[in-house]
Structure formats: structure tokens, C-alpha cells
């Protein structure tokens, strides 16, 4: 009991002390600002309870004259502060300073000599134009510096001297036109560098070599068209890199090979037109690959993504022209679990693509124009345990009988095992105007079972097979046509043809050079009859014009007195020899070659030719066949006569009906077999090259109408 007064005095003293401190704190807090304890994460992501002074959005013109002594975080965002004067009253424990969205125009107006403990400084959305030498050298403990969205056009080589503890540097959205590797000599511990959305003209070799501890590099939105092979040399600890929203037209494969520990790669929103063989290969630590939102991406070629033993996820979505993925595009990816391919222009995905991914757990191919035929039938064959994401958005676009149906609801037996090739409409444009001397590529890809072969036909009718190399043309094995140094002579119609055992598909592009076609010289067309037989005629032709369409028409009119048969054929323009077969002996024909040009004019020429007559042996053979045929016909008529006689003797049958049937049968008009069965049309195989007809059309005109 004697100790009670003492305890009361102690508690009273503590209460008075706390009250005095609270009053002092309240007095020190700047007017209109909020002073309180708030959660805060350090640059190294350590959580702490920090004494925070919040003076955001108050229209302040000057830095607060007095702050609580224990202030750790000072927020001055969205004011009109243009200068920070020297003061002896700066809190010595200040670790975070946010001066974003103010009116600062020079770093020299920011006096930070009394802020040695600062860890984070935010200077975003001010009017800073340059960083002079040693401008922040007193901040030896600084770990984060944000200078995004300023007007920086100049950074002195020694601007960051003294910031040897800096971990994060953000320079996005300024006016920098170059990157100087000397900037980084003073930043050996930098882990994150963001320098996107600057008008940087190009990146040079060894630009980032001093950043030996860099882990994340973001070079987004700076209109880069290429990355030098040695640009990333020295970044041995780099784990993540983003080239988002640049103008790269191909994967910077050689540069990426120098980053041996890369785990995350972002190439989203670049106009890369194809992922080529080996573009992503032997990157032993890569875990995630992003190739989304690429407006020009058409195909992912064979072995494009190869030997990435740690890759877990591929995202290739929202690519409006991505219409082809080679069956062997993804190879040696033992840990790949997630394959995102939704919202592209894919008509199919080969089963072989999926079979090559042993650990695949989920796939997304919805929102694609799926053609429900042989290539995609594996989906419904219950041969996979892979989870399809958003299956309710997976619909058939073709063929018409399945249009609008959910792919998973079409039975695999309703889809053929083999099917025609299909060249995606998005592969290349139908018309293109190019400048003289330029280089152009057309990427032709087709899906089918069996897999199709692809070749090209030039305006002159020249056939270009895969791996063909000339002075002007090169056809890649995948089907890409390169035209080098375009001149007016290269103008005209180029046709890609995809063919397999089932049939063929074609797609053409009309090229103008400097807005016009080559001059039309009213080129000649010559026809030559190379061989005449009793049942066939071999015809060839030559056109001086080099601007033919990809189809040639052939027609033949039989000029015998009673014949009305005519046939026609459309064939590729690279075929200039044609064999007309199954013709009638000793018969005069009119053969016409009709060649349309890109000027909507036609080169047409006709010749008359008479087939040979049959030799004596053939005549004797045909006579024997005719005798045999007549004997069989006589026997057949005899049997019919007996049947009719028996029918007449029967009281239940009408004899007149039988006589009427025989009479009608015998009165059938006669006609040549060639008129009823048009001659088969075969392409002439010249040498070892095999050409496939795109469309063969045979018609018979004016046959007798009362054949029954």
C-alpha cells in the first residue's frame, strides 16, 4: 500500500510526457498536412510502419518550413514547388521524398545536403531538362530514383556519381536520344533500369556492360528497329528484359544469346512478321515468353522455339495475322505447362504440336477462326488430358456444315482424315505498291493433311520451288518469297500454290512498282503443235509478255459434222506445254490459247489441227472390238425379244407396252463416244518437274436431249 502513491506518480508523469510529445507533434505538423503512422515498403520490399507527413495536392509553392523531427516519409505530390531551399531543420531520419507533379526545372534547385538517409526520391512529372555532373552525389544511401515523365534530353557522363547504392533507376518518357554506358559506371549495384518511351535513335554494343548486377531491363516504346548482337554483353545476372512496343521486325536472337540467365522475355507489340527457326533456342533458364499483340506476325516456323529446358509458359495471343504454327514449332520443351494461343487467325493447330509438349497442362485456342476438318480432329479423339481454357468460345468457322458449332461438339468421325490445303487469307495482301529498289517478302503458309508443298509462280510464269535462289528471288523452305531490289520488271501477279494429294489452294498478290505496272508492249503469243497422234495432240505456246495471270485457258472445238463437244482447262501460268488426250481419230480440232494480262487484256491465238487416222492394225483391232460389241448387242436384243414374247403370251401383261419399249430403245440417236465422255485432261510432265493443275474443267455442249 505504501508503494501506491509512487506508482500513481510514475503513471501521471508518463501521461504528461506523452501529452507534451503529442502537442509538440501536432504543432510541428505543417498546416493542412496530415501527420500519421502509415505502412511503407522499403526499396528492398521490407515492410515498416513509417511516420508519414502527407502534403499532397495542397497547391504549395514552397517546401514546408518545419516538419516533425521523426518524419520518415514526406509526400509533396501535385503541388507547385519550384525550389527546395537549404534548411537546418530537415528531419535527419527522412527516408522517402515524393516531389512528383511539381514545377521543378533543375536538379540544382533541390538542396538535399541535409538528407543523407534518403532511400527513395520521386521526381516524376516535373520539368527537369538535364542531370549535370554529380547532381545527387550527397545521397550516398539512395536506393530508388524515379525521374519518369520529365523533359530530360541531357545526362552528363558523371551524373550518377556517388549513387553507388542505387538499386532502381527509372528514366521513362523523357527526351533522351542516346544511351551512354558511362552513365552506369557509378552504378555497380543497379538491379532495375527502365528507360523506355524515349526517342533513342539506336542502342550500341556494350551499352549496358557496367551493370553487372542488373536483373531487370525495360526498353519499351522507343521505336527500336534492331538490337546489335553485342548490345547486352555484360548483363550476366539479367533475368528479365522487355522490348515492348518497339519496331523490331525480327527476333534479336544473337543479342539474346548473350544473356545467359534470362528468365522472362517480353517482345509484345513488335511488328515481327515470323518467328524463324532457332529464334528462341538454347536459352537454358528462360521460364516465360511473351509474343502478344504483334500486328504483322504470320507464322511460327519449324523449330522456332527449341531446347528451352526450363520454359513454363508461352503467350502468343491477340496477333491478328498469326495463321500458321508449324507442327514442329515447339521442340524440346519438357517443362512447358501453359500454351496461350487465343485471339489469333489460326484455322488449325496440328496434333504434332501438342504431342511434342509432354508436360502441357493447359491450352487456350479460343477466338480463332477454326476450320473443323482433318487437322483439328484430334481435339475430340479423347487422346489428351490437356485442359482447354474457355471452351465455350471455341467455334467452327468452316466448313459450312459446321459453321457456328462448338468445336468440342463436332464428332471426330464427322471430320475427314485428309483434307485440302488452306492458305490463310491473312498471309499476305492481295495488292501491294512498293518503291523501286526495295526489298519485300511474302509469307505463304498452308495447313492440310497431308502437309502441303508450297511453290510460287512469277508474273512471267516462272515456277519457284522451295530453296530456289536467283538474282531477284529466294523461296524459303517454309514458303516465304523474298524479292530483292525490286524494279518495274518485277511488277505483276505473284501466286503462291499449296498442293497435296487431295488438291491445291492458291493465293495471289498484285505488285505495283512506284504506283504502276510494267509497260505493255503488246507482246506476241505463239502456238506450236509439237506432236499429233490419233487420240492426242501435244501443244506448246510462248508469250513475249511477262505479266501473265496465274491461269491459262485451253479450249478445243471438234469440227466434225455431228459433234457438239467442247472442253476447257485452267492451269498455272508456269505450264506452257499441254497434252490433249482422248481425242477422236481423223478429226479436225480448233485449239485456242487464251492468256489474260494484268491490264485486263487477253492474248489469244488459235490453230486448227487434224488428228491422225488409225493404222491398219488399230483398225483391225477396233473392227474386232466392233464385231464383238455388235454380237453382244445382238444377243442382248434377242434376250429382250424373248422376254417381250413371253410377256405377250401372258394374259396378265400388255403386249403393246413391250413393243413400245423396244421401239423406243431402237430409235435412240447415235453419237460419238467422245461427245458423251469428254476427253480426260492431263498435264504434260516435262523433264523431272511435276506441275499440278489448279483447276480442270471439261464440258460437253449440245448433247442429244432424249437420252434416257
UniProtKB/Swiss-Prot annotation:
Domain (Ig-like C2-type) ranges: 421-514
Protein name (record): Leucine-rich repeat neuronal protein 3
SUPFAM superfamilies according to UniProt: Fibronectin type III, Immunoglobulin, L domain-like
Residues bearing glycans: 93, 103, 223, 382, 522, 579, 608, 625
Membrane topology: Single-pass type I membrane protein
InterPro entries registered for this protein in UniProt: Cys-rich_flank_reg_C, FN3_dom, FN3_sf, Ig-like_dom, Ig-like_dom_sf, Ig-like_fold, Ig_I-set, Ig_sub
Extracellular side, ranges: 23-628
Transmembrane spans: 629-649
Signal peptide (residue range): 1-22
Species name: Pongo abelii
UniProt-annotated location(s): Membrane
Superkingdom: Eukaryota
Main location class: membrane
Ranges for domain Fibronectin type-III: 523-617
Matching PROSITE patterns: FN3, IG_LIKE, LRR
Matches recorded under CDD domains: FN3
Residues in compartment: Cytoplasmic: 650-708
Pfam families per UniProt: fn3, I-set, LRR_8
Key words, A-Z: Disulfide bond, Glycoprotein, Immunoglobulin domain, Leucine-rich repeat, Membrane, Repeat, Signal, Transmembrane, Transmembrane helix
Record bears the keyword Transmembrane helix: yes
Segments annotated as LRR repeats: 70-91, 93-114, 117-138, 141-162, 165-186, 189-210, 213-234, 237-258, 261-282, 285-304, 310-332, 335-358
Cystine pairs: 444-496
SMART domains xrefs: IG (SM00409), IGc2 (SM00408), LRR_SD22 (SM00365), LRR_TYP (SM00369), LRRCT (SM00082), LRRNT (SM00013)
PANTHER family for the chain: IG(IMMUNOGLOBULIN) AND LRR(LEUCINE RICH REPEAT) DOMAINS, LEUCINE-RICH REPEAT NEURONAL 3A
UniProt keyword Ion transport present: no
Gene Ontology cellular component list: membrane
Domain LRRNT: 23-69
Amino acid at each position: 500500500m505504501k508503494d501506491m502513491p509512487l506508482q500513481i506518480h510514475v503513471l501521471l508523469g508518463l501521461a504528461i510526457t506523452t501529452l507534451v510529445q503529442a502537442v509538440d507533434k501536432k504543432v510541428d505538423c505543417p498546416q493542412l498536412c496530415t501527420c500519421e503512422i502509415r505502412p511503407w515498403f522499403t526499396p528492398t520490399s521490407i515492410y515498416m510502419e513509417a511516420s508519414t507527413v502527407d502534403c499532397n495536392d495542397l497547391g504549395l509553392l514552397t517546401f514546408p518550413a518545419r516538419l516533425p523531427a521523426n518524419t520518415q516519409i514526406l509526400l509533396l505530390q501535385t503541388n507547385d514547388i519550384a525550389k527546395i531551399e537549404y534548411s537546418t531543420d530537415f528531419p535527419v531520419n527522412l527516408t522517402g521524398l515524393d516531389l512528383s507533379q511539381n514545377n521543378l526545372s533543375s536538379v540544382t534547385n533541390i538542396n538535399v545536403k541535409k538528407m543523407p538517409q534518403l532511400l527513395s526520391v520521386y521526381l516524376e512529372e516535373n520539368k527537369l531538362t538535364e542531370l549535370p555532373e554529380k547532381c545527387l552525389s550527397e545521397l550516398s544511401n539512395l536506393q530508388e530514383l524515379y525521374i519518369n515523365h520529365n523533359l530530360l534530353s541531357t545526362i552528363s557522363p558523371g551524373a550518377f556519381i556517388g549513387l553507388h547504392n542505387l538499386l532502381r533507376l527509372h528514366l521513362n518518357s523523357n527526351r533522351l536520344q542516346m544511351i551512354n554506358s558511362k552513365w552506369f559506371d557509378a552504378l555497380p549495384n543497379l538491379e532495375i533500369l527502365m528507360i523506355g518511351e524515349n526517342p533513342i535513335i539506336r542502342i550500341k554494343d556494350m551499352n549496358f556492360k557496367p551493370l553487372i548486377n542488373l536483373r531487370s531491363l525495360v526498353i519499351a516504346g522507343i521505336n527500336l528497329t534492331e538490337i546489335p548482337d553485342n548490345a547486352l554483353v555484360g548483363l550476366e545476372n539479367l533475368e528479365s528484359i522487355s522490348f515492348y512496343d518497339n519496331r523490331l521486325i525480327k527476333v534479336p536472337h544473337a543479342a539474346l544469346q548473350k544473356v545467359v540467365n534470362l528468365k522472362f522475355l517480353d517482345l509484345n507489340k513488335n511488328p515481327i512478321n515470323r518467328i524463324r527457326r532457332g529464334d528462341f533456342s538454347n536459352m537454358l533458364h528462360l521460364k516465360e515468353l511473351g509474343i502478344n499483340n504483334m500486328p504483322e506476325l504470320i507464322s511460327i516456323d519449324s523449330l522456332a522455339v527449341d531446347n528451352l529446358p526450363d520454359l513454363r509458359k508461352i503467350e502468343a495471343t491477340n496477333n491478328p495475322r498469326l495463321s500458321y504454327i508449324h507442327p514442329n514449332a515447339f521442340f524440346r520443351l519438357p517443362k512447358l505447362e501453359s500454351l496461350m494461343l487465343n485471339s489469333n487467325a489460326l484455322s488449325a493447330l496440328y496434333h504434332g504440336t501438342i504431342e511434342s509438349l509432354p508436360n502441357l497442362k493447359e491450352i487456350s485456342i479460343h477466338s480463332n477462326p477454326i476450320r473443323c476438318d482433318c487437322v483439328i480432329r484430334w481435339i475430340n479423339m479423347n487422346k489428351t488430358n490437356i485442359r482447354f481454357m474457355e471452351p465455350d468460345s471455341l467455334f467452327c468457322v468452316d466448313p459450312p456444315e459446321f459453321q457456328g458449332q462448338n468445336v468440342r461438339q463436332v464428332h471426330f468421325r464427322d471430320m475427314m482424315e485428309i483434307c485440302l490445303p488452306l492458305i490463310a487469307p491473312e498471309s499476305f495482301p492481295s495488292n501491294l505498291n512498293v518503291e523501286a529498289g526495295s526489298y519485300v517478302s511474302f509469307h505463304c503458309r498452308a495447313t492440310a493433311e497431308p502437309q502441303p508443298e508450297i511453290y510460287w509462280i512469277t508474273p512471267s510464269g516462272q515456277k519457284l520451288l522451295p530453296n530456289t535462289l536467283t538474282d531477284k528471288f529466294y523461296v524459303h523452305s517454309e514458303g516465304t518469297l523474298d524479292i530483292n531490289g525490286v524494279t518495274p520488271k518485277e511488277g505483276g501477279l505473284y501466286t503462291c500454290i499449296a498442293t497435296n494429294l487431295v488438291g491445291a489452294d492458291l493465293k495471289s498478290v498484285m505488285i505495283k512498282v512506284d504506283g504502276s505496272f510494267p509497260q505493255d508492249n503488246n507482246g506476241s503469243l505463239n502456238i506450236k503443235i509439237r506432236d499429233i497422234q490419233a487420240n492426242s495432240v501435244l501443244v506448246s505456246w510462248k508469250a513475249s509478255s511477262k505479266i501473265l495471270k496465274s491461269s491459262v485457258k485451253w479450249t478445243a472445238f471438234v469440227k466434225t459434222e455431228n459433234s457438239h463437244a467442247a472442253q476447257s482447262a485452267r492451269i498455272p501460268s508456269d505450264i506452257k506445254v499441254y497434252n490433249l488426250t482422248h481425242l477422236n481419230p481423223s478429226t479436225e480440232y480448233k485449239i485456242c490459247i487464251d492468256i489474260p494480262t494484268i491490264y485486263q487484256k487477253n492474248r489469244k491465238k488459235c490453230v486448227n489441227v487434224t488428228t491422225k487416222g488409225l493404222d491398219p492394225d488399230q483398225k483391225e483391232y477396233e473392227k474386232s472390238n466392233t464385231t464383238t460389241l455388235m454380237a453382244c448387242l445382238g444377243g442382248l436384243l434377242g434376250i429382250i425379244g424373248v422376254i417381250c414374247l413371253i410377256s405377250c403370251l401372258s394374259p396378265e401383261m400388255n403386249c403393246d407396252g413391250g413393243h413400245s419399249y423396244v421401239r423406243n430403245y431402237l430409235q435412240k440417236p447415235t453419237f460419238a463416244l467422245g461427245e458423251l465422255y469428254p476427253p480426260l485432261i492431263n498435264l504434260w510432265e516435262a523433264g523431272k518437274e511435276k506441275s499440278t493443275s489448279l483447276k480442270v474443267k471439261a464440258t460437253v455442249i449440245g448433247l442429244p436431249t432424249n437420252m434416257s
